Amino acid sequence: HQDTEITFTNVQYGKLKIQKTVEGDGSLAGWQFRVTDAHGTEIDGSPFASGDDGTILTANLLPGEYTVEELLPEGSLYQCKSDNPQTVAVIQGQTAEVSFVNAIRTGAITIEKVDLEENRLAGATFLLEWSEDGALWQPVAFSETAVRGGCSSTGLADGQLTTDENGSLVFSNLYPGLHY
């Protein structure tokens, strides 16, 4: 009979909280995130989907560096405004947090006014109207944020812009999926 010394080490785990925010009226549920460890291996449960409140809380993780990447579907109407991917340090006994903010991917309409000889014409006024169904139309209104029927172009008045000295104008920050 021989004595043997055995050492047990208690490892205290940490957790990772991913917080999803969407500018405007977008849903917080169902956004997909891949989480990998320092070796590039996906952790159990990855990819994760955000809940109704936009949060994900992972199971216990070993302390160390993890990479969190938002997985946006191809052709998504949203764009990630945060760094993507992001690296975060999980510390034992603590919950590391990382946030991702998305915004609607807006569009723009550029107009260049020229005459028959291709000379650019300044001072021409254009009205831009929008509709959700193609039946009821209304002028775009000034808005600094992306909203249905909004436009952030400087000088917009009653849905109208006037071409500059180069005969150009841009209706910008237009909400996608509408008729213009």
Regions found by a protein language model. Give the residues of each.
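Solvent-exposed loop/turn and edge beta-strand elements of beta-rich ligand-binding domains
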Residues: 1-180
